[in-house]
């Protein structure tokens, strides 16, 4: 029996990443966009065995649900400004570095734009400097970007704990805000993190 769509789906097709954890972020960054399912005519779809038709329609639904981001004029403008800020953001450690804020009504693509830019920035940094950072006695994994999802209930201590959790540090919730900040700052420095995306969602 022919199975033209049998290879479209796999057990690993679910992409339920936790972007607030290093492993989830790297999985998202390193995964290529979903491939477009092959085009079939109505007659070809109707002639498919039931299981193949189910798989094919599921693959189409997933592909359509994950289109984009689409390079609209607004998106291009955001990228240009972020590239200008990050491109000039080469101050030494004792100097204050500039930041950018994306502000708009809900549903207009702030998170989509931020994630698309951060993904491209992450890949560029890895291409430029490699996946590891040499240190005395070994090496650290290069982590160019950190992503944090915040709410109105986030405190300084919980923010620092989220940073520690992103880097997969042991006992990320133990210690004072200052202690957690020192642990997170060491990872930022040693892993050569150059961009921190803070995605604030006020659901209160």
Question: Where in the sequence are the language-model features?
Answer:
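Alpha-helical scaffold elements adjacent to nucleotide-binding pockets in ATP/GTP-utilizing enzyme cores
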Residues: 81, 113-117, 158-166
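Walker A/P-loop nucleotide-binding motif
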Residues: 94-116
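Residue-level preference for the first positions of well-ordered beta-strands
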Residues: 97-101, 145, 195
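Long, charge-dense
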Residues: 128-153
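Mid-core helix/loop region of P-loop NTP-binding domains shared across ATPases and GTPases
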Residues: 38-54, 92, 137-142, 154-162, ...
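Short, internal active-site loops enriched in acidic
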Residues: 103-108, 152-153, 202-203
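A short, basic N-terminal segment
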Residues: 1-96, 127
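Post-Walker A helix-loop "phosphate-sensing" segment adjacent to the P-loop in P-loop NTPases
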Residues: 120-133, 169-170
């Amino acid at each position: 029996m022919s199975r033209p769509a049998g290879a479209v789906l796999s057990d690993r097709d679910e992409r339920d990443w936790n972007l607030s954890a290093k492993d989830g972020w790297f999985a998202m960054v390193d995964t290529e966009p979903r491939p477009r399912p092959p085009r079939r005519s109505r007659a070809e779809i109707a002639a498919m065995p039931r299981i193949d038709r189910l798989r094919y329609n599921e693959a189409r639904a997933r592909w359509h649900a994950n289109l984009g981001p689409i390079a609209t004029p607004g998106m291009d403008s955001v990228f240009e400004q972020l590239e200008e800020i990050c491109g000039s953001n080469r101050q030494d450690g004792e100097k204050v570095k500039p930041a950018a804020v994306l502000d708009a009504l809900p549903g207009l693509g702030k998170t989509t734009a931020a994630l698309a830019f951060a993904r491209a920035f992450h890949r560029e940094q890895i291409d430029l400097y490699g996946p590891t950072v040499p240190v005395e006695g070994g090496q650290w994994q290069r982590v160019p970007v950190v992503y944090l999802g915040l709410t109105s209930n986030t405190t300084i201590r919980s923010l620092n704990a989220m940073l520690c959790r992103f880097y997969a540090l042991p006992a990320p919730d133990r210690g004072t805000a200052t202690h957690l900040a020192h642990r997170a700052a060491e990872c930022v420095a040693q892993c050569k993190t150059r961009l921190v995306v803070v995605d604030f969602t006020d659901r209160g």
